[in-house]
A protein has these predicted regions:
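Flexible glycine-/small-residue-rich
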Residues: 7, 229, 257-259, 382-384, ...
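Short flexible coil/turn linkers enriched for glycine and charged/polar residues
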Residues: 139-141, 152-153, 249, 259, ...
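Terminal RNA-binding accessory module
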Residues: 341-431
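Short, acidic/polar
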Residues: 310-316
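Hydrophobic, well-ordered secondary-structure elements that form the walls
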Residues: 255, 298, 318, 326, ...
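Proteins enriched for Cys/Gly/acidic motifs involved in redox and nucleic-acid/cofactor modification
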Residues: 1-201, 238, 253, 274-289, ...
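Conserved SAM/AdoMet-binding glycine-rich loop
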Residues: 72-73, 81, 86, 185-308, ...
């Protein structure tokens, strides 16, 4: 039997798909790639935007049309956040919530045996535990992703994720370290600690993210640790100082911004100002001293009430920080969130235009940041081979490079000298 997965959304979803792939492989299934025939098609959905829901439905409809005898499965955040809507999507033979995935294999087998359509969505409950979905290997990735936390206790005006993911639940440290040892034994040298609210790790168990990072760095074989998205207001000076002392931690910080305008941040119900965000960036740079450090972020354009002046202020803030990479999104009016009913909704054309302008500016900033690294040296994790000797990869700072590495293979770490940015990657040479 063959199963095909389609994953939307964040690194947590990527990790969870890896766990599901492993579950099916362990029970005799072969994992098919996109475009290949399969007996089961599973979409691990993202519901951050309405567009994400549409993509999930469109993919399953197409697979059902092309493979009328196959079993189709809708799982992930979409059915968990909007169970009634997802349950009505009849092209999915199994609709499965985030808390019901341990039974996904049994339910798929029932459907293969002729069982009628199944809807299994358990609502989140106070006091629920972290769902263990360990992964031993990521078939198409040279870095490993370890899910360490689930859920979010915040209530940002635009975000449906607390509804989809429930309250903060931290994974047991021993379980994380055991999985990390398995991954290093399988040859992985870089691990990404992923979570829905990474700085919240340990809030419910009496520990914290710094303690976890220190323990992960002590695992033999691991050479690089990378952090997922961080909320700036949760990074205390002590937290920052201790992180900067961990040599194996990649000095790249993805600090969630959403807007560089304090008035917009307040409407979003974010709990920091633009000035406080900048202070955290300064504290991180000070903690690293002369060592290089990079910053990446996300930014929303066209949030309700955002004026042209607010937007321009946000753009200026991006210049002030000097981000290596900015993920720019037009605001998506999401049902089930407070912002859905906010007045002063920005017209779709204006949201798209502001996104275009900000993307162009973010690329200019990126070029300026990368120009400063020409001639410097760093380590690169070799990832995708473009030819027999040419590889793409990322430095510790998360600079994308292309390098000729004869005699090396994907998953190895090599030392390089950085060259010019070609608009997609930095050209590098082994030194």
């Amino acid at each position: 039997m063959r199963v095909c997965f389609y994953t939307l959304g964040c690194k947590v979803n990527l990790n969870e798909t890896g766990a599901l792939e492993q579950m099916f492989r362990s029970n005799g299934f072969t994992v098919a790639q996109e475009g290949e025939p399969a007996d089961v098609f599973i979409v691990n959905s993202c519901t951050v935007t309405n567009f994400g829901d549409q993509k999930s439905r469109k993919w399953l409809r197409r697979k059902k049309r092309e493979n009328p005898g196959a079993v189709t499965v809708l799982t992930g955040c979409y059915p968990q956040a909007f169970p009634e809507e997802a349950a009505q999507f009849t092209e999915a033979d199994l609709v499965c919530g985030n808390g019901d995935r341990k039974a996904i294999l049994d339910n798929v087998q029932k459907l293969l045996d002729g069982h009628e359509r199944i809807v299994a969505i358990t609502p989140h409950q106070r006091g629920e535990k972290f769902e263990e979905l360990p992964v031993e290997r990521f078939e198409t990735h040279t870095r490993a992703f370890i899910k360490v936390e689930d859920g979010c206790n915040r209530q940002c005006a635009y975000c449906v994720i607390p509804r989809a993911r429930g309250p903060v639940r931290s994974r047991d440290e021993a379980s994380i370290l055991a999985e990390l040892r398995q991954l290093t034994a399988a040859g992985y040298r870089e691990v990404v600690l992923s979570a829905i609210s990474l700085p919240s790790y340990g809030l419910d168990t009496g520990t914290n993210l710094v303690e976890l990072v220190v323990m992960c760095a002590e695992v033999p074989g691991i050479e690089r640790i990378r952090l997922g998205s961080l909320d700036p207001d949760m990074l205390t000076p002590e937290f920052i100082t201790r992180l900067a002392a961990v040599d194996k931690l990649c000095p790249q910080f993805h600090l969630s911004l959403q807007s560089g305008c304090t008035a917009t941040l307040r409407r979003m119900r974010r709990v920091y100002t633009a000035e406080q965000y900048a202070q955290v960036v300064d504290q991180i740079r000070a903690a690293y001293g002369e060592r290089p450090v990079s910053f990446t972020t996300d930014c929303i354009c066209g949030f309700p009430g955002e004026t042209q002046a607010d937007f321009e202020e946000s753009c200026e803030f991006l210049k002030k920080i000097g981000f290596l990479k900015v993920h720019v999104f037009p605001y998506s009016r999401r049902s089930g969130t407070p912002a859905y009913d906010f007045p002063q909704q920005v017209h779709e054309r204006e949201k798209q235009e502001r996104s275009r302008v900000m993307n162009a500016q973010a690329e200019e900033i990126r070029r300026e940041v990368l120009a400063a690294y020409v001639g410097t040296e760093d380590d690169v994790l070799l990832e995708t081979p473009l030819s027999g000797t040419l590889f793409t990869g990322y430095t510790r700072l998360y600079i994308p490079v292309v390098v000729s590495a004869s005699g090396h293979k994907s998953g190895e770490i090599v030392h390089v000298r950085l060259g010019e940015y070609d608009g997609e990657r930095v050209r590098a040479a082994i030194c």
